[in-house]
Regions:
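Accessory helical-bundle/CTD segments and flexible terminal tails appended to RecA-like ATPase motors
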Residues: 1-93
Length: 93
């Protein structure tokens, strides 16, 4: 699962990406890679960061989805992270 984070402020986005990756690592352990800049790191006025989450093929995706949504809600609950845009790509390439 690719998790894309978008924001207009690059320094704030880097902080958001590090914070989200840390929270995901507490849940998923070493299956979290990143954050990293994708090949196209900016589209119009939005900067982009990518976090990769490796999930086994036999693992229940429903539980993973619930955990991802929970982390996203925790992130957007903070005032400084309200402008965070999150996009999930469950079938990259």
């Amino acid at each position: 699962v690719y998790v894309y984070l978008k924001n207009r402020n690059e320094t704030l986005l880097d902080l958001m990406a590090q914070t989200m990756a840390t929270k995901l690592r507490t849940i998923f352990g070493n299956r979290v890679l990143g954050p990293d800049k994708p090949p196209v790191a900016r589209v119009q006025t939005l900067f982009i960061r990518k976090i990769i989450l490796k999930i086994e093929t036999n693992a229940p995706m429903v539980r993973a989805r619930e955990l991802l949504v929970q982390v996203q809600k925790e992130m957007t609950a903070e005032d400084r992270f309200k402008s965070l845009i999150v996009y999930y790509d469950v079938d990259p390439m």
